[in-house]
Amino acid sequence: MPGAALPSLLAWLAVLLLGRARPADACSCSPIHPQQAFCNADVVIRAKRVSAKEVDSGNDIYGNPIKRIQYEVKQIKMFKGPDQDIEFIYTAPSTEVCGQPLDTGGKKEYLIAGKSEGDGKMHITLCDLVATWDSVSPTQKKSLNQRYQMGCECKISRCLSIPCFVSSSDECLWTDWAMEKIVGGRQAKHYACIKRSDGSCAWYRGMAPPKQEFLDIEDP
């Protein structure tokens, strides 16, 4: 069973920045803003791990059994996903094949984003957003309820060096790496890219929901 402690949200972002330079059959992750991870996911939940076991999940093209880790979880809150609670989370058996380990202690709460498998099940990989709940900033926690969803039609583009420019009005530049040399910087922790009434997108910072004046602003 996987026993490594789960990294914090900032560590997850750092892992994505470094990527996964592994063989062709392994996974490779590109850094993304937490809002992008939310928007790309079918399911986003806050949950606690209850138990874990290795299970068979069919066979590969050569007839060999495919192993996966099945985590039984207790869902605390669903931010995005089906009406049915998530009871089981599946992942590959090791990080070498893109598996995402959860802490074996079972006491930590996590923010988990991944793909739905239906019937109360979901699948996660090393590239998905999985972080200890305590490592999620207060602004990020607020954004999970509505703000991230308000910008899922926007495009967040990573800026690697200054200067960089938007290519369209529905784009937000993610400059944490260019400005701070980290991916888990101020924009990742405190900002959401929100679509405004004129169709343009802009970064919004703050705990409170955006005021109508912000949403009604039009780009010149």
UniProtKB/Swiss-Prot annotation:
Subcellular location per the Swiss-Prot or TrEMBL entry: Secreted
PANTHER family: METALLOPROTEASE INHIBITOR (PTHR11844), METALLOPROTEINASE INHIBITOR 2 (PTHR11844:SF24)
Domain NTR: 27-152
Description of post-translational modifications: The activity of TIMP2 is dependent on the presence of disulfide bonds.
Database matches in SMART domains: NTR
Cystines in this chain: 27-98, 29-127, 39-152, 154-201, 159-164, 172-193
Organism: Gallus gallus (Chicken)
A Pfam family of this chain: TIMP
Protein name: Metalloproteinase inhibitor 2
GO biological process: negative regulation of membrane protein ectodomain proteolysis; response to cytokine; response to hormone
Free-text function comment from the UniProt entry: Complexes with metalloproteinases (such as collagenases) and irreversibly inactivates them by binding to their catalytic zinc cofactor.
Region (Involved in metalloproteinase-binding): 27-30, 95-96
Signal sequence interval, chain numbering: 1-26
